[in-house]
């Protein structure tokens, strides 16, 4: 399927059980946990739910199958959908977990970062045993344990103009779990160009926002925010902080919007949903399509078409700069650790290398693909100098 056209697995099965059969369906729910011949249960389930072939599958999704908003065709559509979650932080990790438990058949999680102690206050998929491991890897392992019937891909990379179309192009829908507007504008370019629906969301302080975006049918992100605001204009997590009760709410709203799109039941109007958990207020704002939008009207994909080169990003919430080489490399972390060990303190695992030079205030985390996060500076030029000094180009 492409985005919001739900197609049932079996066209020969009626959309919903007739009212006269409703009691049989409810009886079936009770029968799942009862002593019942497996063959009889199998036949009864298949008679009513084309998407379910075993008692195990019916037991997993039974509470959704009886919802009129989802039903059998809806569950079939979810199981035949592919969703990518960009960013696996406070909101993205919860979105990923909810989509997995809902039964979305194929999930891809993309995240460039590793688990740090500061994440554990609000990023509920992670615990102390996950420290220093890639977020995408840990998250994919944990949601597979929640639902082993689905396919989950983890991509431990920075999403950028060099790889965004290859990574996201297969998706039926994309959910935003990022922490910066530059990546959101890049996702908006990809989705507009390839007509992929997506859900914009974010949380900071005590409030968060969600907006579903469907190319051609609704305004895009740049109709709402034409340009990336100058640094310091938007609130960020390092300045405003984050109350850990707001990301689960925003993630739940975003996941619900994603499910509605996958089922073809999205609202016809474009709403920006704003929720403040401290004040307990919910607002809905209508977003109007910009008739001169450079992205969705003029098809100028500036964030995809920018000059390709090393990407330098100042990271939200940390005194740090990320460097992503234009050409992906394969760094032999163990060998480099041996060399750097003579200079400073080194820790490494299969995925990352952490280096601290005692003569300076910076700390470098290096990934296998050549990407590095330089802590202790917000100056891109200083970060580039540190990278060039310690990492062979």
Kindly give the residue locations of the regions a language model identified:
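Intrinsically disordered, low-complexity tandem-repeat regions
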Residues: 6, 31-33
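Cys/His-enriched low-complexity segments
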Residues: 13, 23, 37
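Intrinsic-disorder/low-complexity coil detector
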Residues: 7, 16-18, 37, 324
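Adenine nucleotide-associated cytosolic modules
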Residues: 22, 40-393
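Extreme N-terminal basic, low-complexity initiation segments
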Residues: 2-11
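Short hydrophobic targeting helices and cationic amphipathic motifs
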Residues: 11, 16, 26-30
């Amino acid at each position: 399927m492409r985005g919001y056209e739900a197609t049932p697995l079996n066209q020969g099965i009626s959309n919903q059980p007739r009212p006269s059969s409703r009691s049989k369906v409810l009886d079936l729910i009770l029968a799942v946990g009862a002593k019942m011949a497996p063959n009889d249960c199998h036949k009864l389930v298949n008679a009513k739910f084309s998407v379910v072939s075993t008692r195990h599958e019916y037991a997993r999704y039974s509470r959704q199958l009886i919802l009129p908003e989802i039903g059998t065709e809806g569950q079939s559509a979810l199981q035949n959908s592919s969703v990518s979650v960009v960013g696996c932080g406070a909101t993205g990790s919860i979105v990923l977990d909810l989509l997995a438990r809902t039964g979305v058949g194929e999930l891809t999680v993309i995240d460039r970062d590793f688990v740090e102690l500061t994440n554990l206050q609000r990023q509920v998929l992670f615990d102390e045993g996950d420290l220093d491991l890639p977020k995408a890897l840990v998250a994919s392992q944990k949601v597979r344990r929640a639902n082993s019937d689905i396919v989950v891909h983890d991509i431990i990379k920075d999403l950028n103009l060099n790889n965004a179309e290859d990574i996201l192009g297969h998706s039926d829908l994309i959910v935003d779990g990022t922490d910066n507007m530059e990546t959101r504008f890049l996702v908006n370019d990809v989705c507009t160009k390839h007509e992929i629906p997506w859900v914009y969301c974010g949380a900071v302080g005590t409030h968060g926002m969600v907006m579903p975006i469907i190319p051609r049918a609704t305004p895009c992100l740049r109709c709402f925010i034409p340009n990336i605001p100058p640094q310091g204009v938007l609130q960020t997590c390092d300045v405003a902080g984050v109350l850990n009760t707001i990301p689960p709410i925003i993630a739940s709203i975003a996941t619900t919007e994603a499910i509605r799109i996958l089922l073809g039941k999205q609202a016809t109007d474009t709403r920006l949903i704003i929720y403040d958990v401290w004040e307990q207020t919910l607002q809905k704002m209508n977003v109007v399509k910009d008739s001169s939008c450079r992205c969705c009207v003029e098809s100028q994909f500036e964030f995809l078409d920018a000059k390709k080169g090393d990407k330098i990003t100042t990271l939200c919430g940390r005194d740090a700069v990320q460097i992503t080489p234009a050409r992906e490399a394969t760094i032999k972390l163990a060998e480099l650790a041996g060399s750097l060990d003579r200079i400073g303190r080194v820790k490494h695992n299969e995925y990352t290398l952490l280096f601290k030079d005692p003569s300076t205030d910076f700390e470098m985390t290096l990934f296998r693909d050549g990407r590095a996060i330089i802590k202790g500076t917000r100056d891109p030029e200083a970060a580039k100098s540190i990278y060039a000094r310690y990492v062979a180009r």
